[in-house]
């Protein structure tokens, strides 16, 4: 657990106003319950939901990619965690080895809105409903969400980083 992030025994003896203000204004936010109030990218755990979206949209055992260790889109290079690449990767191997390049390429085939739709069905971007006070909702980004939130278009690179649980996905 991450809460509290300080020795709460200091309050038993009493603390000064100076100590209180230092803790309250601490960059690490020691009074924040990071489990229910922290927003963090999910990382590779999202790949199971993205894999379900792939299956729903025709990407399965018959889909193979060559992972060279990175994918270039425009002037941007999106790296796989395995910099030397995985070589030829099918659906099952991509999941077993968490091949980023497979998820990048699959996400480009089906698009962010289909991925977002599947993740919606799984409850991503919503509160858990476990009755925690002040629980924050995460974000399940898509084209409409970005246009509404930032008044900007969705870029292809955002699709690939979302497929591995990074970017606007909190």
What kind of feature is each model-predicted range?
Residues 1-44, 49-170:
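Beta-lactam-recognizing serine transpeptidase/beta-lactamase-like catalytic domain environment
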């Amino acid at each position: 657990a991450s809460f509290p992030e300080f020795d709460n025994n200091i309050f038993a003896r009493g603390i000064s106003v100076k100590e209180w203000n230092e803790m309250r204004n601490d960059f690490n936010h020691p009074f924040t319950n990071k489990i229910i109030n922290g927003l963090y990218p999910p990382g590779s755990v999202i790949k199971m939901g993205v894999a379900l979206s792939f299956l729903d949209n025709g990407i399965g055992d018959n889909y193979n990619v060559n992972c060279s260790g990175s994918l270039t889109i425009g002037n941007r290079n999106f790296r796989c965690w395995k910099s030397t690449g995985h070589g030829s990767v099918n659906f099952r191997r991509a999941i077993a080895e968490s091949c980023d390049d497979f998820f990048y390429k699959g996400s480009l085939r089906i698009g962010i809105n289909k991925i977002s739709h599947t993740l919606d069905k799984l409850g991503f971007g919503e509160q858990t409903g476990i009755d925690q006070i002040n629980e924050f909702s995460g974000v399940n980004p898509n084209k409409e969400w970005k246009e509404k939130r930032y008044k900007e278009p969705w870029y292809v690179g955002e699709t690939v980083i979302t497929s591995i649980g990074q970017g606007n996905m909190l």
